[in-house]
């Protein structure tokens, strides 16, 4: 019993010592704020250069996870709320996008964004699910991803990191480009190449339906 009480006291004191108030008072996490901002921008720029859809989504994941680290490093109440919320919103949105990328490969054997010409009309359900997931990741209202980014931006302003708020806005613009480009190519461009579609397993479509209905 004595050991249990001592352990609880140590945990409680540790949380108090290294909690958000400690980070705010000492500004010991400010370096992590700028490191997260650099990762957000660098990953977004690299994602734009990737023609492989899964590689593009992978670098997008690095960028989005840096949002969470940024919120924790800012350590304000709004930023922490945004970071916590972003864990959920990003998980739902990105799982949907990766499922769609997998479904496109299974049905059409296409991996590259540049090869998606005209596929939006041939795979409407998959592209519809992809669109919902992309809009949530970008943070377009009223999708749930908009709330987490809103709290992160407000948390940055609360900590007087105006430049960080601007970086988050620029990152969202980059998100628009590299996440919506596959949709634009799929519906606005045509290809002379014959693509033989293969029926995807029903489990793939059930998974897609479950993911974007939650988003």
Residue ranges and their predicted role:
Residues 1-13:
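Single conserved hydrophobic/aromatic residue that forms the stacking wall/gate
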Residues 30-38, 77, 119-129, 158-163, ...:
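Membrane-interfacial loop-to-helix junctions in multi-pass transporters
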Residues 4-5, 28-75:
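Internal transmembrane alpha-helices of multipass membrane proteins
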Residues 121-126, 172, 180-215:
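Cytoplasmic/organellar membrane-interface segments at the starts of transmembrane helices
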Residues 42-48, 132-142:
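Transmembrane alpha-helix interface/packing and boundary motifs in multi-pass membrane proteins
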Residues 15-28, 68-86, 155-163:
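Helix-coil boundary and interhelical linker segments in multi-pass alpha-helical membrane proteins
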Residues 61, 101, 145-155:
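Re-entrant/interfacial helical elements at transmembrane boundaries that shape
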Residues 24-39, 87-95:
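Structural signature of hydrophobic alpha-helical transmembrane segments
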């Amino acid at each position: 019993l004595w050991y249990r009480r001592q352990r609880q006291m140590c945990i409680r004191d540790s949380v108090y010592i290294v909690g958000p108030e400690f980070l705010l008072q000492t500004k010991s996490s400010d370096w992590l704020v700028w490191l997260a901002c650099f990762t957000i921008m660098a990953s977004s720029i690299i994602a734009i250069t990737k023609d492989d859809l899964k590689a593009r989504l992978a670098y997008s994941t690095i960028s989005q996870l840096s949002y969470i680290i940024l919120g924790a490093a800012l350590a304000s109440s709004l930023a922490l709320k945004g970071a916590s919320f972003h864990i959920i919103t990003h998980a739902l949105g990105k799982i949907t996008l990766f499922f769609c990328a997998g479904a496109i490969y299974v049905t059409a054997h296409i991996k590259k964004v540049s090869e998606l010409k005209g596929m939006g009309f041939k795979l409407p359900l998959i592209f519809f699910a992809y669109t919902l997931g992309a809009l949530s990741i970008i943070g377009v209202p009223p999708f749930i991803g908009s709330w987490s980014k809103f709290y992160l931006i407000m948390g940055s302003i609360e900590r007087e990191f105006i430049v960080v708020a601007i970086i988050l806005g620029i990152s969202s613009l980059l998100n628009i480009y590299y996440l919506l480009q596959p949709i634009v190519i799929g519906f606005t461009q045509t290809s002379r190449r014959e693509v033989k579609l293969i029926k995807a397993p029903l489990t793939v479509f059930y998974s897609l339906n479950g993911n974007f209905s939650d988003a």
